[in-house]
Amino acid sequence: GKTQVIKKDHKKYNWLAGQEANRVINVFPNGKMTSSADYKGLYAKTTSTKPMKVKLTRLDDLKFNDDLFIPMPTGTVADKFFSNEGGFMPGSNIMAAGAPGVGKTTVLLELLHKVHANNPNKKVLFISAEMNQLDMARYLKRFPHWGQLPILFLSDYTDANPQAVIESTLNQGWDLVLTDSYTEVNDTVKEECNLTRSKTEKWFLDLMIAQNQGKNKRKVYTTFVTILQLSKGGTFVGSNKLKHMTTAMMELNWKGGENSAQRY
């Protein structure tokens, strides 16, 4: 379109001067003018894209802390599965899937305890969104040696801000964190903080990555073992972003029929 300049001597000048900001002036061939709201976003600001500087990285130029390559062994046969070095590797993410009741929480809590028992300097944490204190009391009857494991019960913070609670807790710096489960933690934060599912997942995954990188008070490279729920079809419940940041995937299953004594 052409630019039309309206001077003071124009018969429409006073009418135009009285229009509110961001009104669209429609000019017709016969000279008629009307005013309307900006339905098409004609006043929307355009942003200029700055030239992007791309920096390529050579693996030889990367510098890593030696602590990243020191495993956290459990002293069990499971160490051979977790890494070639034997044990949980710092800054990694292990996803644990399995049918309900197969014993995911029990097995992983035992491994969590064994990491700390093998090296008391390693701080371990259990984040429970599935069970409350009463549920864990029953576990304690069977596994009294779990008595000193630090546990964050999200059910204790239903009237608080679970998002801030998780951030504050993880910021203390933990070597190994067991989360039960990924879906329940996300759902708790989503409901209590009025976030969308995608924003909640992005927040939690970004938080995990930051902890992997040692962005906490102790500057330790946190390893996460995250329990996943399975759908009826046997696939895990979660976003593809979770798949992409996974270091390793483990599955616990029944050996033989469901509820059999043996698992693998």
Where are these regions (language model features)?
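Interdomain "pre-motor" coupling segment immediately N-terminal to P-loop NTPase/helicase cores
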Residues: I25, Y39-T49
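Structural motif
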Residues: M95, L176-D180, V225
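Phosphate-binding P-loop
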Residues: N84-G91
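N-terminal pre-Walker A segment at the start of P-loop NTPase domains
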Residues: M52-F81
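Conserved P-loop
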Residues: N93-A160
